[in-house]
Curated annotation (Swiss-Prot):
Residues 1-26 form the signal peptide. This is Protein AfaD. Keywords: Plasmid, Signal. InterPro entries: Adhesion_dom_sf (IPR008966), AfaD (IPR008394), Dr_adhesin_sf (IPR037028). CDD domains: AfaD-like. To E.coli AggB. Pfam families: AfaD. SUPFAM superfamilies: Bacterial adhesins. It comes from the Bacteria. The keyword Cytoplasm does not apply. Residues 91-111 are annotated as: Disordered. Coiled coil: none annotated.
Length: 147
């Protein structure tokens, strides 16, 4: 196998369908890996791009990762390599997204009534990444008005 192929960082992302409990409002999530060749990631480099779709009435979107948060920061995470020996620091965000505020907040949110919006998973700081497979999962919800 070619050495440069072995050095490629693979990020495995799953597509998830999250349903908010007690509400008929469902959020569809689609995630596409941006992969990469080489072992250096610059701060802000896109690791994956996602799309959240809310087909029913809503006032915003909420996206989070199911990974270890960095220093309690809502939008920053550490992803372990499949073998558990290496780490990749990432953050979620993009145009119009803001970290969820408050203690215990997780992820980013964005106001809006569009049917779908895009978000990014980006490198958090300049990093030298060990070759390997880095898996992570992303969750999402449609924000509905309180009655």
């Amino acid at each position: 196998m070619n050495g440069s192929i072995r050095k490629m960082m693979r990020v495995t992302c799953g597509m998830l369908l999250m349903v908010m409990s007690g509400v008929s409002q469902a959020a569809e999530l689609h995630l596409e890996s941006r992969g990469g060749s080489g072992t250096q990631l610059r701060d802000g480099a896109k690791v994956a791009t996602g799309r959240i779709i809310c087909r029913e009435a809503h006032t915003g979107f909420h996206v989070w990762m199911n990974e270890r948060q960095v220093d309690g920061r809502a939008e920053r995470y550490v992803v372990q390599s499949k073998d558990g020996r290496h780490e990749l620091r990432v953050r979620t965000g993009g145009d119009g997204w803001s970290p969820v505020k408050g203690e215990g907040g997780k992820g980013v949110s964005r106001p809006g009534q569009e049917e779908q919006v895009f978000f990014d998973v980006m490198a958090d700081g300049n990093q030298d990444i060990a070759p390997g497979e880095y898996r992570f999962s992303v969750g999402g919800a449609c924000v509905v008005p309180q009655e």
